């Protein structure tokens, strides 16, 4: 009987050239897939951001249903309460709202415990942050550590303070003049001659990556001046330097600023081409960086009677 001897069979491996070809093919596939993955990730982040703005917009209407008016942007005297505090009960943050002591300033115990994140104001929530950025950003620029947010209210085409401008023409929110700590004005749905669908409510800002940096963009629990607001003096993601009045860290690429002047903070995001914005009727729209300044400013007033192209 004749048998075949397989002991001498040679098993040949890949040659170096073949390995290089395989690696090159894999690299090409990765290169083709990465942009698609990044687009999906950004689309998801953008959708999350839009949903968060929707929740804030619903909150102001629920507040209005309860009190017959929108919340003030800030109440200076005696305890300096900023707008998020009024809306916590309407964004499923009842526990935080119940722990916050409205008889004390936001910087006082137990609202804020100096140099720690143990105070009520340090409580963070997903609704504070856009999916394109950090989900835990906090302010550590002074002793009173607190949460920050990508979401801020419309302050209109004016700097802070309002410098004597008639406030009812501009932002729909009650305001506190920084120079004299005046009582806030209250707005309701009867005071929107321009229409709630044509009046901005919220949009986005970028925050500095370093919590310890004294950059108050997104410092929305602080009632002072620019904190927690955006202005429409410049279009979204403008390359024009923002004026901080002393509290910003310049990032010439995404967050340009000058540490001087009366405050102006532009709407900004990491989304490609523009920012998400909510309107006072609860609708959410993506606003392009290329929107005309005239239209952008018209959208930020509640009683300006401006005429603009609705197809912005």
Language-model region placement:
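Surface-exposed loop/linker segments characteristic of extracytoplasmic
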Residues: 43-312
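N-terminal secretory signal peptides that target proteins for export/translocation
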Residues: 1-9
